Each structure stands twice: as C-alpha cells, then as structure tokens.
C-alpha cells in the first residue's frame, strides 16, 4: 500500500470512534463538531490547497443567493468549470493539488450541486404555494428553509464521507442533526454486520495486487507473454481494484453507521443517496423509537455481491458507488439532451469521466459502457425471450461471464490512465470486447431486437430472481 492509501485508511478508521462520540450529541454539537473534524482533516491532508474547497463553496452559495430559482444549473456549471481549472493548475504554473484535495473536491462538487437543487425545489414549491393561495403539507424531502452560509459550510466540511463518500443530500444531513431519540437508533450491531467482510477483502487486495502488480502491464516484457496470459491479467487487476474499493466504502459506511448517520425506519423505504421515498412520521417517544426497525440504505455505497454476481452491465453500474450513481441518475441522466436510453447513458458516462478527471483512460473506459449497454440490450431483446427456462438460465450465466470480462477490460483504462498504455494493452488483446460488443449489437439489430429505451428488458422484472439463482449455485 502507498502512503496515500494508508492515510485514507486512517481517516476512514478514525471516523468510526468519532461517529460514536457524535451519535447522541445535540444538533449544535453535531453540526459544528462534525464540521470542525472535517475541516481539521481537510487542512491536515490538503494544507493550503484547502482554499479550493472554500472558493467552490462560496461561489455556490453566492449563486444560490442570487438566483434561487435556477441555481441548480448554475451550480452545476460553476462546480464543473472549477474542476477544469482545478485540474489545469499545473499547466498554468500553479501548485498542483494533493490527491486528498482532489478527493475532497470531487465529493464537494456532488454535495453543492445537490444542495443547489434542493434549494431550487424549495423556492419553486414556495412560489407554487403563494400562487395557489393555500398551505399544503411539505413535500417529502423538501428543506424547511434556505441554509445560511455557515450552515452551508458545516454541511460541506462535515467529516462524514468527506474524502471517500458516501454522498448524501443536505436533507439527509439535516435529518441526522435533528434525529429524535438517537440513542434508540442501532449502531453497533449494524456496524459489525457491515464490517465483517472488510478484513477478508483487505487481505485479498494485498495478495492480488502483490501477485499481479499493475506496473507489469506498463513494461515491454509483458507484451512478450502469450495471448492467454495477457487476456487473463486483466481479471486479477480488476479483482484487486474491486477489493480495494470494497474495503474503503465499507469502512466509510461504518463511519456513518457509528454516528447513526443516514438511519431511517425501514418503512421509509430509503434509497442509496436519495433517502426516504415514503413519508414516515418521526417517533414521539423513546419507546416508539426503540420499537422501530431501521436501516442504513441511504448511505449504502456498495453492494459487493450485486457487483460481482448481477447478470447485466446495466445492473453492475447500479451496485457500484451507489450514492454517486443516484446523483448521476438524478442530476445528469434525467436532464440529458437525448431521449434514447443509450445516448442518455453515453452523456452520463461522459460527464462521469470528466468528474473523475482528465486522464484519457477514464474516457476510453466510460465511453465503452454505452456500447456494451446497447449490445446487451438489443441482443437480449431479440433472443432471450425465445429460449426455454433452461436456455434462459444458461443465457444468464454466459451473460454474467461476459459482463465480468467487459468490466475487467474497461477497468484497465481506468487504472492505466494514459491513452498510450490503455490502447497498447487493449491492442495486445485485439480490442476483443469492442469487437464482440459490435457483433452482438449488429446481430441484435438484424434479429429485430428492441431499443433499450423503448422496451422492457425480459430479465428486468426478474433480475433479483436471477441474482438469487446465481447465489444458490
């Protein structure tokens, strides 16, 4: 592990005992104590580069104050434009930010765009109420008022997920501050249930990254190896990549769980990133609060089993970095300037690549996803429904195998970063995923498969059952 990885791990582990300290605190101590810890971590790891986060926050707050009815689009433009400046600092002869500064900036961008959207929703709801002339019950998830500058700063610098996620909305943050009877919200048992696989994943990461180092792919000697070896190598590289993020995100979730952050009654049917989808009145007494069943779906960032064993490329995205996937779906996919599912996905993947950075490998990887989505969608629509139950089961196993190989292939661009290294590796295995995806897409079109945006995927309604079948076997 690199020194940076050790620092990330220490930050994640420290957040767990800190969470237990804040869990039963009052709203004021939670707000300002959590912000002080987060600001301290930012200053410690980023130093003077912390100024970038402050500039981004102040700029967003100014836009919210100036144009509350359109601040969402303005905040998106501002924060994404600042990301470009932030990443071009070395080209401008300015000090290059640390990797920790980049991590803080990435999560801060998501939070501020979401905050602007929540403020815009509040402003539009207030205008609608004034126009109608009567008071209505507040909409689920609506903010009670526009946050002040200090409240915006406290949300932005809250230590929870400050470098690794999970992403959370201001409404989720506010619910944590005002959580009734926090002592009734379970933390220790959910934390232990969530944390138990992390040590195993950590050991698997250390073992796989040691046996199959990524740096080997950048050496000339690697390309003298036989084709089967080159093909196989992407599998352990992606495996190590997954194990690394599994550990990081599970630890980050445990930090939230320790603080009771993102806990809602199961009846609220909370979604990762978005929070509750059903209105659930707060408990009126400690006894009622203790009788409720809670979950932490709002801050769930990774479904390890779903990532590894879901059947389709499309589903694989949903189980990975789940809170960020919600953000992308809510603020990018829904407002994409296209109607086609594949084109909307391409637009979303393009902006996701930009959010991650300017390395060409990000774009090569992310822009391969829409091709895979189109290929699996058209071919599945054309063929799978005509198969027998046994044939569909075999189809799903083959589909799962190819889905995993596609992600292995795309991961190489994400970790190699440069265009030269990525294309060199892909060329050494003859761009086989691209060619296979094009062949499947062509076959699906010839056989009359429907567009993914205009049909219901035959396995969509039974995706959970298919996943269970894979689990059983």
Curated annotation (Swiss-Prot):
Record has Membrane as a keyword? yes
Region Disordered: what ranges? 451-473
Q: What is its main location?
A: endoplasmic reticulum
Keyword Endoplasmic reticulum (UniProt): yes
* Topology versus the membrane: Multi-pass membrane protein
Lumenal compartment segments: 23-33, 94-194, 262-426
Glycosylation sites noted in the Swiss-Prot or TrEMBL record:
321
Disrupted gene: phenotype observed:
Knockout mice die within a month and show atrophy of the cerebral cortex and hippocampus. Embryos at 18.5 dpc have a forebrain smaller in size and show disordered cortical lamination and delayed neuronal migration in the cortex. Mice with conditional knockout in hepatocyte develop hepatic steatosis spontaneously, and hepatic fibrosis on high fat diet feeding.
Subcellular locations according to the entry: Endoplasmic reticulum membrane
The protein's GO terms of the molecular function aspect are: lysophospholipid acyltransferase activity; O-acyltransferase activity
Which keywords appear in this protein's UniProt record, sorted alphabetically? Acyltransferase, Endoplasmic reticulum, Glycoprotein, Lipid biosynthesis, Lipid metabolism, Membrane, Phospholipid biosynthesis, Phospholipid metabolism, Transferase, Transmembrane, Transmembrane helix
Can you name a GO cellular component term? endoplasmic reticulum membrane
Q: Which domain of life is it from?
A: Eukaryota
| Catalysed reactions listed for this entry | a 1-acyl-sn-glycero-3-phospho-(1D-myo-inositol) + an acyl-CoA = a 1,2-diacyl-sn-glycero-3-phospho-(1D-myo-inositol) + CoA; 1-octadecanoyl-sn-glycero-3-phospho-(1D-myo-inositol) + (5Z,8Z,11Z,14Z)-eicosatetraenoyl-CoA = 1-octadecanoyl-2-(5Z,8Z,11Z,14Z-eicosatetraenoyl)-sn-glycero-3-phospho-(1D-myo-inositol) + CoA; a 1-acyl-sn-glycero-3-phospho-(1D-myo-inositol) + (5Z,8Z,11Z,14Z)-eicosatetraenoyl-CoA = a 1-acyl-2-(5Z,8Z,11Z,14Z-eicosatetraenoyl)-sn-glycero-3-phospho-(1D-myo-inositol) + CoA; (5Z,8Z,11Z,14Z)-eicosatetraenoyl-CoA + 1-hexadecanoyl-sn-glycero-3-phosphocholine = 1-hexadecanoyl-2-(5Z,8Z,11Z,14Z-eicosatetraenoyl)-sn-glycero-3-phosphocholine + CoA
Identify the pathway: Lipid metabolism; phospholipid metabolism
GO BP? layer formation in cerebral cortex; phosphatidylcholine acyl-chain remodeling; phosphatidylinositol acyl-chain remodeling; phosphatidylinositol biosynthetic process; phosphatidylinositol metabolic process; regulation of triglyceride metabolic process; ventricular system development
Binding partners and assembly: Interacts with SPTSSA; the interaction facilitates MBOAT7 location to mitochondria-associated membranes (MAMs).
**What this chain does, per the record?**
Acyltransferase which catalyzes the transfer of an acyl group from an acyl-CoA to a lysophosphatidylinositol (1-acylglycerophosphatidylinositol or LPI) leading to the production of a phosphatidylinositol (1,2-diacyl-sn-glycero-3-phosphoinositol or PI) and participates in the reacylation step of the phospholipid remodeling pathway also known as the Lands cycle. Prefers arachidonoyl-CoA as the acyl donor, thus contributing to the regulation of free levels arachidonic acid in cell.
- Which protein family is it in? Belongs to the membrane-bound acyltransferase family.
Question: What is the protein name stated in its UniProt record?
Answer: Membrane-bound acylglycerophosphatidylinositol O-acyltransferase MBOAT7
Q: Which organism is it from?
A: Mus musculus (Mouse)
Its encoding gene is what? Answer: Mboat7
